[in-house]
């Protein structure tokens, strides 16, 4: 399939929730990706795990192969030894405490918002401060937390309780903090 045919396939069958670059990526290795036309590209895109771990590291590929041969997915209704061992490793090498596993940045941010509300609910704190130009995800709460009007279009009214302040404006940040702010 050509690059243009793949792009047309997406136009016909995939919701356009991202502005995509006109490249079809077919391979990755380390910090590089290759497109369908054979161009080698240094992958410097932020926000996704591959930016931190690279593409197709042999140890990661082997670990995935091994696990896929045993069990691909287990619902959180059940226990999983690898998940338990990962939680232990993260806790012991990080800040201690317990882990919250999730599948995306939006889910992580949504979880953080809920945790902040839960932790501060007895003090009647329910507001959140986010910075203008931020991006927090595509769930309802994280779209609301995203202080960019272009992401709000079509989803109004947004959830209440979000305050937007300019980046690097300490006075605006201080002014936004009230007794109702959870995070």
Regions found by a protein language model. Give the residues of each.
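Active-site-adjacent loop/helix segments that line or gate small-molecule/cofactor pockets in enzymes
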Residues: 1-29
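PLP-dependent aspartate aminotransferase-fold enzymes
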Residues: 87-183
């Amino acid at each position: 399939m050509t690059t243009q045919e793949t792009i047309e396939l997406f136009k016909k069958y995939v919701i356009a929730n991202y502005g995509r670059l006109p490249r079809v990526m077919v391979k990755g290795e380390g910090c590089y990706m290759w497109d369908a036309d054979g161009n080698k590209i240094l992958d410097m895109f932020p926000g996704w795990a591959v930016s931190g771990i690279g593409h197709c590291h042999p140890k990661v590929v082997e670990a995935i192969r091994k696990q896929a041969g045993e069990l691909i997915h287990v619902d959180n209704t059940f226990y999983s030894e690898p998940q338990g061992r990962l939680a232990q490793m993260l806790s012991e090498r990080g800040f201690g405490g317990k882990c919250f596993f999730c599948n995306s940045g939006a889910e992580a941010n949504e979880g953080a918002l809920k945790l902040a509300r839960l932790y501060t609910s007895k003090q009647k704190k329910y507001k959140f401060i986010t910075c203008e130009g931020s991006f927090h995800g595509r769930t309802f709460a994280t779209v609301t937390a995203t202080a960019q009007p272009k992401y709000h279009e079509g989803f109004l009214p947004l959830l209440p309780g979000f305050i937007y302040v300019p980046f690097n404006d300490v006075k605006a940040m201080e002014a936004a903090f009230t007794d109702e702010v959870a995070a």
